[in-house]
């Protein structure tokens, strides 16, 4: 597996399970990807640093012919287009709305929480401060969303 620091970097493996990670903080993104790797995730993580890049990526893949992500990990405080707008556009799209979106943010604001759920977020989690706590959070995300949860996937 390889790590990079540029928008559009990919953590690749053979399993077709794709997670779209939308995170502008390099350190947070690296820790999240490292936690998935240490937990034995064998899919692919596609990391984008801003909301516009995420929407462009999803629009490109939405048309068919390319694999859509099976889960989106979304920060709210993003450059260019904020996470709330990314979430709103995902959930308004007939083809994308079934993709689980997990907000992973530092925001503890009740307004952000209410707004995310009004836009049909699947889960809202606060980023832990330590790597060990983040690793536990990622482990729980992986166990629930990639293990127990069943979803129909994109339309």
Curated annotation (Swiss-Prot):
The modification 4-aspartylphosphate is found at residue 75. Keywords: Phosphoprotein, Transcription, Transcription regulation, Two-component regulatory system. It comes from the Archaea. Pfam families: Response_reg. Induction: Transcriptionally regulated by FilR1. Residues 18-142 form the Response regulatory domain. SUPFAM superfamilies: CheY-like. GO terms for biological process: phosphorelay signal transduction system. Phosphorylated by FilI. Member of the two-component regulatory system FilI/FilRs, which is involved in the regulation of methanogenesis. This is Probable methanogenesis regulatory protein FilR2. It comes from Methanothrix harundinacea (strain 6Ac) (Methanosaeta harundinacea). The gene is filR2.
